[in-house]
């Protein structure tokens, strides 16, 4: 039996529909500073995030048609940067938003693990790292809403 998603989590108390005009992407650091990551919601924010890397890169927002995606960049063979791109979610139910953020968080964690050159991190380290990344992305998603 499938439980109606809205019965699990009523996000209407937390998020309104629409994007905030004031939101600016904020670079976050992974544990031990291997990867920096941020969340963007539109092309303007994508441009600002890429511009802040000083690389001259230009890339369309959500170049691949999907709900959300993480793109990765390496600057001067030093640090990896990940940009989580998620567009308008005004017609999504709150569970779909949470599921998407968790899914994309896993991709950021995969980049972190790769940058650390860690094949088998401890279960607890992995769980705590993913929790940290997810909480940052959830906070940024919340800030990006009106």
Q: Where are the model-predicted features located?
A:
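Active-site recognition of the HExxH zinc-binding catalytic motif
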Residues: 99-111
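Structural signature of transmembrane alpha-helix termini at the membrane-water interface
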Residues: 7, 109-112, 141
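A conserved mid-domain beta-alpha-beta active-site/ligand-binding segment of alpha/beta enzyme cores
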Residues: 41, 49-52
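Post-HExxH zinc-binding segment in Zn-dependent metallohydrolases
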Residues: 120-146
């Amino acid at each position: 039996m499938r439980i109606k998603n809205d019965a699990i989590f009523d996000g209407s108390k937390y998020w309104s529909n629409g994007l905030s005009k004031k939101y600016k992407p904020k670079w976050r650091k992974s544990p031990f500073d291997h990867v920096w990551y941020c969340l963007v919601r539109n092309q303007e924010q994508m441009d600002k995030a890429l511009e802040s890397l000083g690389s001259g890169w230009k890339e369309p927002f959500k170049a691949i048609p999907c709900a959300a995606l993480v793109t990765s960049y390496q600057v001067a063979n030093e640090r990896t940067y990940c940009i989580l791109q998620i567009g308008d979610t005004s017609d999504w139910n709150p569970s779909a938003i949470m599921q998407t953020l968790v899914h994309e968080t896993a991709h950021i964690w995969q980049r972190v693990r790769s940058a650390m050159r860690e094949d088998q991190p401890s279960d607890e380290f992995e769980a705590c790292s993913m929790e940290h990344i997810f909480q940052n992305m959830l906070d940024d998603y919340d800030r990006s809403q009106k």
